[in-house]
């Protein structure tokens, strides 16, 4: 292949090149001829780009605009506290009501800017003049010459307020457009004009308007004043920041050349002939690399410009990702970028790309097919197939900058979208209403349609996670993507202990992680049933250093059961070695030297990828309960491929903790919506019954009553229609059979983990406390939150599953190995939950008799060193409804109590329908009769508690009488 042929295929015929037929001078060589041609190419590129070079330091002098070229929020104008991004385009309010203006004003012409909402709460966005003064009560729209729209309250503001627009949602793009020539202001939501908001605004001499936003506490948004292309440009309106036209022209040329080079390089990767240039002594591949460097050195500075990154780079990457070549063009492109771009250029390039994809993904979809979300996931997945890029994104972006959990979410459609999909609404009623029941088939079909659309997005999300969990891209010098992901996920889960993230996002993330785990487990391990062996809780293979254990504090357990640990692990195991070193260090009163002490076990050094005197010690000390410096895991990542079983079990462990910390809350939240809907249904049925009675009355006074009742029924119908559409989404996305089966599968895993750990005698004490909490959470989720919408009978072998759990609860109630106070309470409340539910009480009655008698015996023990109220409550439940004083669901004197309603949660304080158990009544009788000494002790404890309770009650009554008398 000739040099001229290569160059002209890439750059065209205008490049002046030395002809190969020209006889070179004596001092010329083949090498110098290649250099001359490369210089010619470089000069051609610079000359061509110079024709479109932007003029330096030119002021944006468009008529009607005042201010600097680069538009951003002006921190000198802020009122209240904000968190603001480095580029001063994203803000988060930290005061009750905070206001900030941009640094550019307009006085003539038509102008616009866009805001992407990060939340949906109280925000006023619009325009104001320089003379408008704001405080923590007054924001934009609350003063004379300021104008605003608030989609939270669906109103427009200019001192007075009027209904305007439509409700907004997180991810919405709100455009704010001002026409200074005609004195009008308009707002658009996701490209749809909301109508004329204001007319005849004050214009003329001395009046220039600044983009202005006012946000309530924790509300947040990101502005686009023109630094990137407008998502929904409005014809005739200009962005406040001008597009970099010359740089766009340069980038267009460069990326066209780069595409041709990439295609040639890619095509030659599978070609073995003509490796050397015909007219030189350089390989074709090396010459192509020289050309690539010549082009990419000009691309580098351009991709750091946000507008170029979004307008040119992202579509370019999208184009490459759609090619069907082998190897993929995109991977070749990324290889070249990593080779020739500067580090900071590559960082900005990837960050701009991922931030754009996240912005597009978070945008509220107008179509059920989620085209923008699928497109973003497709492209991110393709990018992550490149090893170096994937590892960089995991280390620096997906957890630290953009939160990968946002890519795991599937947002509901807005009200209009749901109404288009769920045209006919239905809800369960008893007795059934024919006018509602006729819509059932259509409603359930709509639910299936939603579920099908969601499942396509979920499949892409799981595919992305599987790629991020790649375990084959490490070597002796670098960790795998899985190692990075697990470390970052652990920190992400721990952060949720202290912060409150959006609940729907966390639940979606939980389900995707669980499905990805099962896909990887089946592919790499394949054993069944799945559970976490107890050894993982005491051999430091999984980091539980920041976690309470069932048996108490980890360092105490290590000391108490040292001999057993040594027998199980061996005297040279890293856990034993670390304990010895910690003991030696404490003897010289110098805890800070723990990091300097060597781990003598060479096996562990190989696992962690450090030498015996390396920095891996911190990890082991922390994992066995010693914290030499801080609680942050600063140990080096393990190098090379991880053990598939151990690494996936670590992932599963994090998933279980993640569910316990946050994911369970969303299930409870949607259950509240379902219960609220049930209350509306009951209220409407009662109102209809009253209407029928009123119709039978002939008194004219009842005519007005009928009108009022009809109005009330219409209000209920409107609310129920809205809730029924939301429930359609919940049925498809949260309470689907697939999601229910995932929760049930995880419950079996947790139950089997606890059951097998219990067989290891004292080692059971090392089980992290959140496993017992997760057992309770998963039981409640299946039994109370998902059921009856997702009937528990759908779960295969659900009775056997709950029977195993019930037996575990009976056997481990008051287990001496469980020392942690919270764990004791959690186990007791889980047992109580089984007692008050008819389904699980029946299962509890079918556990082996030995286990039933054991739990009753423990319940009847005296109240030394344990909570007595919960035990009494369980005992009382065995009789409630089976005796003259226990026949009420709610005490009569409380049945008409007026006051705020409590959230419906599983709690012993909630009124519950009686559900007596003759089986356990008989066990209580038998245990009391067979153990007279223990019975006497129990009765003494009961009488003491009654004496104390009555004394307190009488004392309070006397004090009340004294206060009322005075």
Regions found by a protein language model. Give the residues of each.
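Eukaryote-specific, cytoplasm-facing alpha-helical/coiled-coil scaffolding segments in long proteins
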Residues: 235-241, 537-548, 677-690, 806-807, ...
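Alpha-helical solenoid repeats of the armadillo/HEAT superfamily
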Residues: 508, 766-780, 798-800, 818-832, ...
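HEAT/armadillo-like alpha-solenoid scaffolds in large eukaryotic assembly and transport factors
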Residues: 669-677, 731-738, 786-802, 816-822, ...
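PRY/SPRY (B30.2) beta-sandwich protein-interaction domains
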Residues: 1-370, 374, 379
């Amino acid at each position: 292949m000739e040099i001229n042929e290569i160059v002209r295929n890439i750059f065209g015929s205008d490049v002046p090149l030395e002809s190969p037929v020209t006889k070179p001078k004596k001092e010329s060589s083949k090498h110098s001829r290649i250099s001359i041609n490369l210089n010619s190419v470089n000069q051609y590129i610079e000359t061509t780009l110079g024709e479109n070079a932007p003029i330096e330091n030119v002021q944006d002098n468009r008529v009607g605009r005042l201010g600097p070229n680069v538009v951003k929020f002006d921190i000198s104008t802020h009122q209240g506290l904000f968190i603001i991004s480095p580029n001063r385009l994203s803000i988060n309010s930290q005061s009750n009501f905070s206001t900030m203006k941009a640094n550019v004003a307009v006085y003539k012409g038509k102008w616009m800017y866009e805001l992407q909402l990060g939340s949906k709460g109280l925000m006023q966005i619009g325009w104001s003049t320089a003379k408008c003064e704001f405080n923590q009560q007054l924001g934009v729209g609350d003063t004379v010459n300021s104008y605003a729209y608030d989609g939270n309250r669906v109103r427009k503001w200019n001192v007075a307020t009027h209904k305007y627009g439509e409700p907004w949602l997180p991810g919405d793009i709100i455009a704010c457009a001002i026409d200074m020539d005609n004195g009008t202001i308009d707002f658009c939501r996701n490209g749809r004009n909301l109508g004329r908001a204001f007319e005849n605004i004050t214009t003329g001499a001395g009046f220039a308007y600044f983009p202005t936003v006012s946000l309530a506490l924790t509300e947040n948004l990101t502005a686009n004043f023109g630094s990137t292309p407008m998502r929904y440009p409005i014809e005739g309106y200009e962005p406040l920041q001008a597009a970099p036209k010359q740089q766009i022209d340069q980038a267009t040329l460069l990326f066209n050349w780069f595409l041709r080079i990439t295609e040639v390089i890619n095509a030659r990767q599978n070609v073995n002939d003509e490796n050397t240039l015909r007219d030189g002594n350089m390989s074709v591949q090396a010459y192509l690399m020289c050309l690539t460097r010549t082009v990419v050195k000009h691309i580098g500075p351009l991709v750091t410009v946000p507008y170029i990154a979004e307008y040119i780079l992202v579509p370019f990457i999208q184009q490459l990702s759609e090619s069907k070549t082998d190897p993929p063009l995109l991977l070749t492109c990324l290889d070249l970028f990593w080779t020739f771009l500067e580090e900071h250029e590559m960082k900005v390039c990837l960050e701009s790309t991922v931030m754009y994809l996240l912005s597009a993904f978070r945008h509220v979809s107008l179509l059920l097919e989620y085209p923008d979300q699928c497109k973003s996931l497709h492209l991110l997945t393709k990018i992550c197939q490149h090893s170096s890029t994937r590892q960089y994104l995991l280390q620096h972006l997906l957890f630290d900058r953009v939160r990968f959990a946002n890519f795991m979410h599937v947002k509901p459609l807005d009200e209009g979208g749901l109404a288009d999909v769920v045209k006919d609404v239905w809800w369960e009623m008893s007795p059934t209403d024919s006018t509602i029941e006729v819509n059932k088939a259509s409603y359930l079909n709509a639910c299936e349609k939603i579920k099908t659309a969601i499942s396509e997005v979920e499949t892409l999300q799981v595919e992305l996670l599987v790629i991020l969990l790649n375990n084959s891209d490490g070597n002796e010098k670098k960790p795998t993507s899985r190692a990075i992901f697990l470390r970052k996920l652990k920190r992400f889960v721990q952060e949720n202990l202290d912060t409150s993230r959006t609940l729907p996002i966390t639940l979606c993330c939980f389900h995707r992680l669980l499905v990805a785990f099962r896909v990887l487990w089946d592919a790499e391990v394949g054993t069944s049933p799945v559970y976490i062996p107890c050894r993982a809780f005491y051999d430091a293979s999984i980091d539980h250093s920041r976690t309470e254990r069932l048996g108490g504090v980890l360092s105490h357990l290590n000391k108490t059961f040292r001999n057993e640990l040594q027998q199980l692990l061996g005297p040279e195991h890293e856990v034993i070695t670390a304990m010895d070193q910690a003991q030696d260090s404490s003897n010289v009163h110098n805890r800070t030297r723990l990091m300097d002490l060597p781990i003598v076990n060479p096996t562990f050094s190989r696992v962690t990828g450090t030498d015996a005197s390396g920095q891996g010690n911190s990890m082991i000390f922390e994992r066995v309960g010693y914290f030499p410096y801080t609680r942050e895991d600063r140990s080096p990542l393990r190098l090379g491929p991880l053990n598939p079983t151990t690494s996936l079990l670590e992932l599963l462990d994090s998933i279980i903790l993640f569910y316990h910390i946050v994911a369970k809350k969303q299930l409870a939240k949607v259950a509240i919506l379902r219960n609220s809907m049930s209350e509306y249904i009951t209220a409407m049925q009662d109102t209809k019954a009253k209407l029928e009675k009123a119709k039978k009355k002939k008194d004219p006074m009842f005519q007005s009553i009928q009108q009022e009742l009809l109005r009330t029924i219409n209000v209920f119908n409107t609310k129920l229609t809205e809730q029924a559409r939301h429930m359609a989404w919940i049925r498809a996305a949260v309470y689907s059979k697939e999601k229910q089966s995932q929760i049930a599968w995880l419950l079996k895993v947790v139950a089997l983990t606890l059951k097998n750990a219990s067989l290891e005698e004292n080692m059971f004490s090392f089980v992290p406390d959140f496993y017992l909490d997760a057992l309770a959470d998963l039981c409640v989720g299946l039994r109370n939150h998902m059921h009856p919408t997702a009937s528990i009978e759908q779960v295969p072998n659900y009775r056997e599953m709950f029977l195993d759990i019930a037996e575990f609860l009976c056997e481990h109630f008051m287990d001496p190995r469980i020392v942690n106070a919270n764990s004791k309470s959690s186990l007791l409340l889980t047992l109580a939950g089984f007692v008050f539910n008819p389904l699980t009480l029946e299962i509890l009655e079918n556990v082996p008799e030995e286990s039933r008698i054991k739990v009753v015996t423990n319940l009847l023990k005296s109240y030394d060193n344990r909570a007595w109220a919960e035990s009494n409550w369980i005992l009382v439940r065995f009789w409630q409804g089976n005796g003259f004083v226990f026949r009420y669901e709610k005490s009569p004197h409380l049945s008409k109590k007026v006051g705020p309603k409590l959230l419906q949660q599983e709690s012993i304080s909630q009124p519950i329908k009686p559900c007596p158990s003759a089986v356990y009544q008989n066990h209580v009788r038998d245990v009391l009769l067979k153990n007279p000494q223990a019975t006497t002790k129990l009765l003494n404890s009961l009488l003491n508690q009654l004496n104390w309770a009555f004394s307190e009650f009488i004392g309070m009554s006397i004090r009340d009488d004294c206060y009322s008398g005075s």
